[in-house]
Amino acid sequence: PPHNLTEVVDGIIAVIDDPMITTEELMTHIQGPDFPTGGVIMGKSGIRNAYTTGRGKIILRAKAEIEEHNDRNRIVVTEIPYQVNKAKLEKHINELVRDGKIDGISSTRDESTEHIRLVIELKRDANPNVVLNNLFKYTQMQDTFGIILLALVDKQPKILTLREMIDYYIAHQEDVISRRTQFELDK
């Protein structure tokens, strides 16, 4: 999964400075995946499993707020889980309302410009927390994202821990610098 480059570089520097650093200590530098569409990662156990075993799964939720507008509540979604298509999400919500699987929604509209803004207008008598929980349950506003830290090691695919990935990266960089230096000396 994508990560914040600054956090990854900080983690690499931490491993170089302290070769005995544990995964828990490394997680203070590399806190978890950083998805471009945002979303909220629910819990740390999935990240911890992925970083310690090379496999894990995380639950991503859309970032949504309940607002009051003209004596009615509405749910405003400002971030969606990674790889979720906003237009398909809106269409799916409308289908669920039409089929009667989710009650309390009067309309949806996409007010996005530069940033995501999906507005879900609620009926007057609707409980916004119940509607929001149903949206998480029945739509991709809550999604599971599997993590496999897979890389080629000696031309063979191998599942690595976070620490092993960083160690292989550092070894690769040392090899590149050694070869470049030897090439320059041989000129």
Q: What does each model-identified segment do?
A:
Residues 2-187:
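C-terminal interaction appendages of subunits in large macromolecular complexes
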